[in-house]
Amino acid sequence: MSTQSRWQELADQVRHHRQLYYYGEPEISDADFDALLQELKDLEQAHPEVVTGASPTEEVAPAPPTSSPFRNVDHREQMLSLDNVFDTEQLAGWLDRTPAKTYLTELKIDGASINLLYIDGQLELALTRGDGTTGEDITHNARTLDDIPDTLHGTDEFPVPELVEIRGEVFIDVEDFAAMNAQRQAEGLKMFANPRNAAAGAMRQKNSADTAKRPLKLICHGIGAREGFSPASQHDAYRAIAAWGLPVSPYTKQVHSAKEVQQQVEYWGNHRHDAAHEMDGLVVKVDSLEEQLELGHTSRAPRWAIAYKYPPEEAMTTLHNIRVGIGRTGRATPYAVMAPKYVAGSTVSMATLHNPTEAHRKGVLLGDTITIRKAGEVIPEVLGPVEDKRTGAERPFLFSTFCPECGTRLAPSKVGDADWRCPNTQYCPGQLHTRLTYLASRKAFDIDALGEKGAYDLIHSGVLADESELFDLRAEDLEKTSSYATKAGKLNKSGETLLEKLQSAKEADLWRVLVALSIRHVGPTAAKALAKHFESVEDIASASAEEMAGIDGVAETIAESISDWFTVDWHRRIVDRWAAAGVRMRREAGNVPGAADGVDSALLEGLTIVVTGSLEDFDRTAAKEAIEARGGKAAGSVSKKTDFLVAGEKAGSKLKKAEDLGVPVLDEAAFKELLENGAPSSGDDASTSADSVDD
């Protein structure tokens, strides 16, 4: 291939993958894209004569697609990208070329860029980066973020300017992403590959209600056009932005030498998991805005800033097998079984392959050396085989078209569906097993005495034909199992506990009953919305899909799934037998979903409360449920709209932000007082001794 042909091929590939990164589903990793772009840059530097026309190395990003449903609007000031370096030698070269009295270092967040235009303190526009000159108008979606105020609030030191563009990154932090994907998996929905895709997709939703469902956050990292605002430094600009009520990174640091910059690069390379969000690099900026102006910019990036990109956290291991798991709604999910490997902070031995199409697309063979990456710090991802290490002993994996649990032929539920499912929903032991363990989980009946082994024993001992018989279990039934009986065949302590827990579960809230039924797509969020609207399971069964879809929190897909579920005879038998056994199928009068007996369901109504750090008597889920049971909103991030921050040990950045914004901080004792008596009146002191909380 000629040099000219290689240049054209690389240019086409870079443009293709950049378009997918911003407006579609990426096909390659960020590291692979960076390698493509770097090869193109190196080739252009060695052979400048091959560049014909515009090169993607000089472009900020692709222009918004012509088919976009969003209005295209010009930025007041061009919104540039950043150049990258990939090792300390390259960084040292940039520092030599860009001497400064003070540098600013900040974490490079892997999210979706946004440009906020405020005129006289009012939010006028929110735009995507677009091609750097023109972005898409996503104002309606931006307004759903708690971190983006409609109105800026000035101070004596930092009055609100006539006009200012504030640049930032919309993202989903690691903890929220894990919870969101777990919820989607529980509801049978497709999981997101990584937080960046989830955040970027959320900001380009046509319906802002869909955007609002995702736990989006914002960190501001720059300014564009401005009138009536002339900060001396980037650091001063961040102080002003924070004073106006917008979030800035708690990890930003001023340093005064190239050596200190390199120390920050080394530090964050060893502590990248300490940040609440995903980060793939460290951004270094010249702090002085006057010096920035003197240095200027190229057509795509400022000369006064650089991004040091850390290597992605990948590792090589051996693929031993590919197995197929059957979920509670019948979805067949292939997963890789690997030699255990420590990567991204934990040891992994399995990785999902999502569906048969994805499994075959990866091109892995049994016995392969494979490259894995922890995607989103939660889901191990198989990137592909290391073909150079193949010995010839590897063998292909043949995806069976039959259910590994019951032998029924697998098939997509509809044409074009990438997921294959076992249609034997009633009698497949694999589906029954996962349904039993799911209904026993904390998000449903919370029966801790019914684990995976116990569920397996109940099924394979012949004690349970399906979950409809669960609440009819007697001591003599459990004595037929190994999990709940002594060697002498008498009921053991676990069996006694199970019977007690089953009795308690009969009084569970209506929303928990709905979750326990394993209706496809119905998780706790949708179940709570339904339980607030309807009085009983029978009311829900009688409702039309259209009526249910009109409820906030119940999408059309969920509504249709519920309607379909109640048309199946054996599903109705579950409801009937549970009711006959004494399971409460109605919402108690005045009982808000999730509320405990005797709790005032309006005690915290209208309050937004954030919990951070470790509490002695509450885990994160219990604290959230306690707040919601009393009518409050349990938020994931601190903003001007936050009423209280509950700070346990190692509270970290959220505590600092709350203090900066003047949000009242509660220790655990004060939190318990709040749950008992509600918020203090306006004349009371709402703050507690935050000094006693470790940062």
Curated annotation (Swiss-Prot):
HAMAP family: DNA_ligase_A. InterPro entries: BRCT_dom, BRCT_dom_sf, DisA/LigA_HHH, DNA_ligase, DNA_ligase_AS, DNAligase_adenylation, DNAligase_N, NA-bd_OB-fold. It is an enzyme of class 6 (ligase). This is DNA ligase. CDD domains: BRCT_DNA_ligase_like, LIGANc. SMART domains: BRCT, LIGANc. Pfam families: BRCT, DNA_ligase_aden, DNA_ligase_OB, DNA_ligase_ZBD, HHH_2, Nlig-Ia. Residues 52-71, 676-695 are annotated as: Disordered. The keyword 4Fe-4S does not apply.
